[in-house]
From Swiss-Prot:
Catalyzes the decarboxylation of four acetate groups of uroporphyrinogen-III to yield coproporphyrinogen-III. GO terms for biological process: protoporphyrinogen IX biosynthetic process. The keyword Mitochondrion does not apply. Belongs to the uroporphyrinogen decarboxylase family. PANTHER family: METHYLTETRAHYDROFOLATE:HOMOCYSTEINE METHYLTRANSFERASE RELATED, UROPORPHYRINOGEN DECARBOXYLASE. Substrate binds at residues 30-34, 79, 154, 209, 336. One of its GO terms (molecular function) is uroporphyrinogen decarboxylase activity. It is found in: Cytoplasm. The record marks 79 as: Transition state stabilizer. Homodimer. This is Uroporphyrinogen decarboxylase. One of its GO terms (cellular component) is cytosol. InterPro entries: UROD/MetE-like_sf, Uroporphyrinogen_deCO2ase_HemE, Uroporphyrinogen_deCOase.
């Protein structure tokens, strides 16, 4: 099965599919967000969650960066905790803090009480996708979800955490409860992703933002089976799939194994790489014929244009070497999201520069 739309000229879809793109494709994680004054103006009238659940607002925010930048993909404006909220979890996204859980999930009773995700609860997200598919023309739309481990960390810790102590303690001390929680979150993530695919997204990305806190052994035992189930199921739908985490150099091989689960001919698998690992090194770590995405340090965008140009050129050159070394393709991106203080003019100039190489 092909992607939802026949976007045969898309540089992004070419690169992630192992075909030679007409130019180096580029898009940015958090390209729609606090770096844009038009986003900040709109958010004065809507909370983060309200914006996610209002189809016209989510559509407008998704489109904002495309009016400024000639990026090669749009990514749905949403948040990884949206399906948790839709499933009845008491949470809020607190400015300058992140997701805060009203009643953390820490016992077997808490896990048992979790409700499944009902499709009707996330219809506004799918309605936003329908609006975007109609508006985007030949620009592909990326849908996304949080991976079970990262969602579990928010639920168990009660909010953002540097070291995830309660999460790891449950994982190691109560493995049966842990896997029950992960199974429930895997089902939730699949419901969210498959609904997005049915609504018309052209690719998906799964963010395991906090997986880098784990050892490779723990990742393989407690996380990989659940992430693999997600990708194996999504693979049936034939859309390109990207797996991304921060600080995951030692996990890249296992993460690529997850995204290649249920592999079929023409399987379109991508692994996101942060700035701590070179793309050529990543190419040696991931499974053969996996495309790579990344990996400019977002802080470089604050360092002035000469530094941006120099480091961005290095990333593109490294990506080309990675393809020679066996990567299926390279999509230029940051190694994490656009920082709020980033000048949109620098991003615009960066897109033009990448396309010129």
């Amino acid at each position: 099965m092909s992607t939802r739309r026949e976007l045969l000229e898309s540089p992004y879809l070419a690169a992630v599919s192992g075909r030679k793109p007409c130019r180096v494709p580029v898009w940015f994680m958090r390209q729609a967000g606090r770096s844009l004054p038009e986003y900040r103006a709109l958010r004065e009238r809507y909370s983060m969650l309200a914006a996610c659940f209002e189809p016209e607002v989510a559509c407008e925010i998704t489109l904002q960066p495309l009016r400024r930048y000639d990026v090669d993909a749009a990514i749905l404006f949403s948040d990884i905790v949206v399906p948790l909220c839709a499933a009845g979890i008491d949470l809020d996204i607190v400015p300058d803090v992140g997701p805060v859980i009203g009643d953390p999930v820490r016992t077997a009773t808490d896990i048992h009480a979790m409700k499944p995700l009902e499709p009707q609860a996330i219809q506004p997200i799918f309605q936003a996708i329908s609006l975007l598919v109609a508006a985007l023309g030949d620009v592909p739309l990326i849908g996304f979800a949080g991976a079970p481990f990262t969602l579990a960390s928010y639920l168990v810790e009660g909010g953002p955490s540097r070291n995830h102590p309660r999460t790891k303690a449950m994982m190691l001390a109560e493995p049966a409860s842990w896997h029950t929680l992960m199974d429930k979150l895997t089902d939730l993530t699949l419901g969210f992703l498959l609904g997005q695919i049915d609504a018309g997204v052209d690719a998906i990305q799964v963010f395991d933002s906090w997986a880098g806190t784990l050892s490779l052994s723990d990742y393989r035992q407690y996380v990989l089976p659940h992430s693999a189930r997600i990708f194996a199921t999504v693979a049936e739908h034939g859309v390109p799939m990207t797996h991304f985490g921060v600080g995951t150099a030692d996990l890249l091989g296992a993460m690529s194994a997850a995204v290649r689960s249920g592999e079929k001919p023409g399987h379109q698998a991508v692994v996101g790489v942060d700035w701590r690992t070179s793309l050529t090194d990543a190419a040696a770590r991931v499974e053969p014929c996996t495309a790579l995405q990344g990996n400019l340090d977002p802080v470089v965008l604050l360092a002035g244009w000469p530094a941006v140009e120099r480091v961005a050129r290095t990333v593109v050159d490294d990506g080309r070497r990675a393809v020679v070394a066996g990567a299926a393709g390279h999509v230029f991106n940051l190694g994490h999201g656009v920082l709020p203080e980033t000048d949109p003019g620098v991003l615009s100039e960066l897109v033009s520069f990448i396309h010129s190489l």
